[in-house]
Every structure is written in C-alpha cells, then in structure tokens.
C-alpha cells in the first residue's frame, strides 16, 4: 500500500496487536466519520483504517494530543450498521505504525509509517521463552474459566509452526489481564525478547492472583459449611436439652436469687410472678427471652446493699483542702452539709447544685465529697438528654427496652448509697419524647425518691440513700427543678488563685503523667503568670492545664531528641519558643477615648467578659437599629436607654427639632456570639449620650447595671466575674449599681486594690464618671 494518510479511530478500552482479529463497537461521532471516510485499496480491494488507544478512558471527545502515537494499521473485514446510529466492525490488525501529522477535524486523520520488530538474534533462547509463556498461559486458562477455548486453540496452532514467534507474542499480549497502559507499552516495544519477558512476568502475576482468589473462595466455602454445621448441631443440642430438662439448672439459679436477695415485698412478688411465667413458657419463644432479661435486670440491682460509710468532717475537710485551692465558702457549705449527715443519716438534706463556669472544679469537688463520705462515686451526664426514658426507663413491652440511667448506674457500681453526680443539669432539653427535667423531679424530691418507680421495673426502688449532687454552668434551670435544689455558686478564679493551683496541682500532675523527673524541667512563676495572662482567657483552669500539658510535651521532646540536654528551664523570656506567639492581650484597654463607644461588662456561662458597645447616627426616619445578635432583653434595654435619653435631651444641650431625620445604629461586636441580659442599660445610655453630644467616653472606664426610664440604676448579678474581666482587660475604673455594694465583701482584696470601684444610683452619676466632660446646656440641635 502506497497510502501515507488514513482515517484514524480512537479506542477507549482496548489495545489491538498485529495479527489479531478483533470486533469493535463504534458509536462516537468522530469514529463514525472516520469509518465513513475509509476507501477501498487498489492493491487488494480492501478498506484500511488506523486505530489507537486514547490516554484517558473517560474522555468523550479526546484531542489529538490525548492519543498515543504508536497505533495499528487495520484491515476492515466486516461492517454491520446497528440502530441508534452505531456500528459494529470486525478488523484484522496488519501492522504496528507510528503516527504523524494528526489532523483533528470532523474525524481524525494521520500519516503513518510501519514500525518493524527488531531481529531475533538467538532463536533457541526465544523458543524457550515462548514455550515458557505458552505453558504459563495454559495454566492460567485452566484456572480462569473466562479464557475462551478458541483462543487456546489459535495459540496451539501457531505453536505447531514453531517459527512465527512474533504472532504468538502478539496473541498472548492481547489476552493478558493487565492495565491498558501496560498493553500499550507492549505494543510500543520493538524488542521481542523484552516483550515476551514482560508477558511471562504478567502471566506469572495473573496465576498467583488467580490461585489466591481460588484459595480464598475455598476458605469462605468451608467457613460457610462449618457455620451451617455448627448451627445444625446447636439446634440439635437445644432439642436434646429440652428433652433432658437441662434448662432447669438456670431456672434454679434464678429461683435461688429471688429467695436470697433482700428484695422489697413488692419486688419479690413481682419476681415470683414473672418466674412462674418463665417456667411455664417454651424456652425457645421470644417472650421467654423478654421475661428472662427482666428477671436478670431486677435481680442484678443492689437491693439492700449499702457501703459502710463513716463521715468524719475533719477528714473530709482535709480531703477538700488537699484537692482544691481557694473556694472557701463552697467548702464551708459542703462541710456543713456533711456535718448534718454525720449527726443523723436519716435527715434528708437538700440536693446540692454547684453552679459555675467550666473548669472551676465542680466535678472534682463531688469526687472529693464522695471520698470524704467513704462512698462510691458515679456520674450521670445529662448534657443533651432529651428523652425522659433516659431517666425513667422504657416499658418492657418495647423491643430492646432497658431501665433508666439512674438504676443503670446503681446496677453498675453495686451499691444503693453512692454519691451520684448529675452533670450538666442545665443542658437538658425536651421534645416529643417527653421532658427529662420533669422526670428528674421525682428523683430529686426527698419526699418522693424513696418510692421511685422505673418504667421498666414497674416496682418501687428506694433512692433516698443516694446522695445526688448536680452541676451546671448557667442559672437557667426549670423553676420546679431549681426549687428542689440548694444552689452553691462557684465563681471564677483570680490570677493569684490560678497561680497557686498551677504550681501546687497542675504542674505536678502533668510532670507525673509525663514521667518527668524533678531535675529535668522547671517552670518559673513568671512563666506561669504569662500562661495565665497571655495564653488563656477563662474563669477556670482547664485551658491553663492544657497549655501546661503542651509545654511539658514540647520540653520533653527536646530532652529526648537532644541527648546533651539534661535540663530545661522555662521562664517568661523563652515561653514563646515553646508555645508560639501570645494568644491574648492582657491589661490593654482602648488606646484613645472614643465618641459613641462604651465598655460594658457581661456575665456568661464561661465567666465575665468585656462588652464593647458602639453607635453611629445617620440620615433616616428616627428609628433605632441594633445588631450583634442581641437577645430580646438587650434590645428592650436599648429602646429604654434611647427613650430615657430623649426625655433628658434638653439637659444635654440638644433640642427635639430633628430626631425624626436620623437613625441611630447600636452595634455590639463579635456578631456571631449571642448576647442577652438585663445589665447593659448604663453602657447603652452612655454610648447614646456620647454619640449625640460628641463627648468621648473614658477608655479606662467600664460599667454594669440596668436602668429604668426614669434613670435609676438597678442591681445586677455576677459581680465578681465582671470585676475579674475588667481587671484582665486593663480597666481602671468600674461603675457598679449602688445596691451591689454589699457584694463587694466577696471580692478578693487584690482585685479591689487594682480597680477603682464606684457605686452609682442614677445615670447622672454614671455620666459624671464615664464621660470626659459633662454635657453643657447650649440649646443646640443635633448636627449630623
């Protein structure tokens, strides 16, 4: 053939080798165009076409750069047109060719040049390699039933000639189970020895994989047969046991427990009734399993089992002081509680509820109380509980039913008088499954919990000997539940307390945990102070402990990595080398006095926070807008502050002339954090006055307190936490409601020394201390 250019067809999923006849389904537009452009050769009255593999399988319309240059010159033996504008062709690969000058138009077209195979120099060696490959292929064909018998027959016919090694290699290559890339490499390889070597390697791998798969199938089949055999024998054993009445031994154990346990009268009658039903049932029935589970649960509870606890308030006080620094008032109330129990265990004291921010030691206090009482400790976390069945249990008629967590904890620790922590009691919620807070009322009421009935047991269980202690972060508890508990407030730690806790508790704890020797690492007091000030911002010490843990890990890594380092000393100078840049600013208030910007004080679940309140005025309709994700209470405080300002505008030298011509926008930054509460009135009022009179607010002054429309300042809560936040934030003066002066006795002396605390009773006093100067009555209208 003298043609130098032919239509070119791209193949998705096959590589054709010379001498091989292969069917091809044609459906893509370019491929059909290429097929239609084939012409009959003058030499042998046949049609020819070029075929090559595309580089990416999922390419619907590959470009000429996405085709391999080594292709096949193929003779078209047959064309069969199919429905949906597709066709099936049968081709015979004539020769391997090198493509050039590929044209990418409606159809591919390319020039070609035939690539001959290299000469076989060692015929004897080649014959050995081919024989080896054919034997391997025969073995593979025996293992893999997918190989067509006609292929084996074709190979055997070629082998009989013993001369056309190239044809044998091509046939074997076309039927290898390997990647398209590997087959393309085989096509491109002109050295017959290298090609047959690759074929042998691939066939060997295929045989190993086939044998492994076959062995795995055999193993799975044997396992299935064994499982079926075991099941059959197990069922036979059950039938034999039924005939021999061997189940009687298990029933006898249940009956023995019913008689020996100190069950209540009601529980014993219920157990005997259920046992009679169980004995009369078919032991293979589903109802039998339900009854058996019920009896096992009922009899596994610690009926009449109590720890011999002996309360010694002196020892309890030592334990509390050993495990906790500070918290004097809290410890005092706990000792009073234990003193009452020591004198008379029959007195039903109140349920304690420890309320405070995270990390202040609520959970560890409860553990210390349990140790001081000589009782076991157990914990029931209520965070996220929204199903009352978690408390009361599910009725046994339900599939997979079980008792509630209260009895579940007693079953676990095997005593009826533990100290039980009800953790995160403020995090419960209710939905269509009921209200768990209402279910807790019976548990926490001393008049009712001696007759607690779990839905699963359906008999009374005495919880009056359990010491329940709850913890919460927020005061926001259901009224009925709150009424049954005595709330003990645990405020955040001051800097000095955190320092002592870190030195005496946290650092030794981390050194012990990480197996640090005393002479390996030292952390200076200055470094701990910097940790508290610049790497944590919390009321508790949980984050401080994490930072100390990170510090210990990094120092230990240096010691182990560098054998010459025997001791590491950490102080404020090299602290950043271990923990990186400082995370927070400490003692930095605003740099300048601002107009329309005031610092308020907030009390959140995690302690006190500084709250910046800012405002702007602009042309509008006389409306007031609030942003910053404010709650309803805070929005109403803003409205009240604005109304109070309007009523006193003439006192500040402003007229009523143009209020309807502008809007006031009040914003509290950190808009992603919800903010609410009745203590921002003073700050809101001061912000508005500063904005309208253009008088700056002292940058070192913060304030807290709600106001009335008449300008009176109302008391607030969380005073200690707010003063701690002011001290951390570099505030010098704090304005507090006059009615909160009585709470100053609970404030640590060092906080009161660092702050100038001024009590105020009305907004005039607030403005006197907050503004740079008092507004003068000039009788002017506000000018934008």
From Swiss-Prot:
Enzyme class: hydrolase
InterPro entries named in the record: AAA+_ATPase, ATPase_AAA_core, Lon_bac, Lon_bac/euk-typ, Lon_lid, Lon_proteolytic, Lon_Prtase, Lon_prtase_N
Domain Lon N-terminal: 6-207
Record-level Gene Ontology MF annotations: ATP binding; ATP hydrolysis activity; ATP-dependent peptidase activity; sequence-specific DNA binding; serine-type endopeptidase activity
Any Gene Ontology biological process: cellular response to heat
CDD domains: RecA-like_Lon (cd19500)
PANTHER family on file: ATP DEPENDENT LON PROTEASE FAMILY MEMBER (PTHR10046)
Record-stated family: Belongs to the peptidase S16 family.
Record-given protein name: Lon protease
This protein's encoding gene: lon
């Amino acid at each position: 053939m003298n043609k130098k250019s032919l239509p070119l067809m791209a193949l998705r999923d096959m590589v054709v080798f010379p001498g091989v006849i292969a069917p091809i389904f044609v459906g893509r537009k370019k491929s059909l165009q290429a097929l239609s452009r084939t012409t009959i050769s003058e030499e042998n009255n046949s049609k020819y076409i070029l075929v090559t593999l595309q580089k990416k399988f999922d390419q619907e319309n590959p470009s000429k750069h996405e085709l391999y240059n080594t292709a096949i010159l193929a003779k078209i033996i047959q064309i069969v047109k199919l429905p949906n504008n597709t066709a099936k062709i049968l081709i015979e690969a004539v020769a391997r060719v090198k493509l050039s000058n590929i044209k990418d138009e409606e159809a591919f077209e390319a020039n070609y040049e035939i690539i001959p195979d290299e000469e076989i120099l060692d015929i004897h060696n080649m014959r050995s390699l081919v024989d080896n490959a054919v034997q391997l292929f025969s073995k593979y064909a025996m293992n893999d039933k997918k190989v067509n018998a006609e292929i084996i027959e074709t190979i055997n016919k070629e082998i009989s000639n013993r001369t056309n090694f190239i044809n044998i290699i091509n046939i074997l290559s076309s039927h290898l189970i390997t990647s398209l890339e590997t087959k393309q490499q085989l096509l491109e390889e002109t050295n017959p020895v290298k090609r047959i070597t690759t074929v042998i390697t691939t066939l060997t791998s295929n045989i190993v994989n086939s044998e492994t798969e076959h062995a795995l199938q055999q193993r799975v089949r044997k396992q299935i047969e064994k499982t079926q055999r075991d099941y059959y024998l197990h069922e036979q054993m059950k039938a034999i046991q039924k005939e021999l009445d061997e189940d009687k031994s298990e029933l006898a154990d249940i009956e023995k427990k019913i008689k020996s346990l100190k069950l209540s009268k009601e529980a014993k009658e219920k157990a005997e009734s259920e046992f009679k039903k169980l004995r009369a049932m078919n032991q293979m029935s589903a109802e039998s399993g339900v009854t058996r589970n019920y009896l096992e649960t009922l009899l596994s509870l610690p009926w009449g089992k109590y720890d011999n606890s002996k309360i010694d308030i002196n020892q309890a006080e030592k334990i509390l002081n050993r495990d906790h620094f500070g918290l004097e008032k809290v410890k005092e109330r706990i000792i009073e509680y234990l003193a009452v129990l020591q004198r008379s265990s029959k007195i039903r004291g109140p349920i304690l509820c420890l309320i405070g921010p995270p990390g202040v030691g609520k959970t560890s206090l409860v553990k210390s109380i349990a140790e001081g009482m000589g009782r076991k400790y157990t914990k029931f976390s209520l965070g996220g509980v929204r199903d009352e069945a978690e408390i009361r249990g599910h009725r046994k008629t339900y599939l997979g039913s079980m008792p509630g967590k209260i009895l579940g904890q007693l079953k676990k620790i095997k005593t009826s008088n533990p100290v039980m922590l009800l953790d995160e009691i403020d995090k419960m919620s209710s939905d269509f499954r009921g209200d768990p807070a209402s279910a807790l009322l019976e548990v926490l009421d001393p008049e009712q919990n001696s007759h607690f009935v779990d839905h699963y047991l359906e008999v009374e269980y005495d919880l009056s000997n359990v010491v329940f202690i709850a913890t919460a972060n927020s005061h926001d508890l259901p009224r009925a539940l709150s009424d049954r508990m005595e709330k003990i407030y645990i405020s955040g730690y001051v800097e000095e307390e955190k320092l002592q806790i870190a030195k005496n508790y946290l650092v030794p704890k981390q050194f012990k945990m990480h197996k640090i020797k005393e002479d390996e690492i030292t952390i200076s007091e200055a470094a701990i102070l910097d940790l508290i000030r610049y790497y944590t911002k919390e009321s508790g010490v949980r984050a401080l402990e994490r930072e100390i843990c990170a510090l210990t890990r990094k120092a230990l890594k240096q010691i182990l990595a560098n054998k010459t380092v025997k001791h590491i000393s950490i102080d404020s100078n090299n602290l950043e080398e271990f923990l990186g840049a400082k995370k927070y600013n400490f003692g930095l208030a605003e740099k300048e006095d601002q107009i329309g910007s005031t610092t308020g004080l907030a009390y959140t679940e995690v302690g006190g926070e500084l709250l910046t309140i800012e405002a702007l005025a602009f042309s509008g309709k006389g409306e007031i807008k609030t942003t910053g994700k404010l709650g309803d209470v805070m929005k109403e405080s803003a409205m009240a502050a604005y109304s109070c300002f309007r009523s006193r505008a003439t006192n500040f030298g402003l007229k009523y002339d143009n209020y309807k011509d502008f809007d006031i926008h009040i914003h509290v930054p950190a808009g992603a954090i919800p903010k609410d509460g009745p203590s921002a009135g003073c700050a809101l009022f001061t912000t508005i006055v500063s904005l309208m009179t253009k008088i700056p607010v002292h940058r070192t002054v913060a304030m807290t307190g709600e106001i009335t429309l008449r300008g009176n300042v109302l008391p607030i809560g969380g005073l200690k936490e707010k003063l701690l936040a002011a001290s951390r934030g570099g505030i010098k003066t704090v304005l507090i409601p006059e009615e909160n002066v009585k709470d100053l006795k609970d404030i640590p002396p060092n906080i009161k020394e660092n702050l100038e605390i001024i009590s105020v009773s009305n907004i005039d006093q607030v403005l006197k201390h907050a503004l740079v100067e008092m507004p003068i009555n000039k009788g002017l209208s506000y000018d934008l």
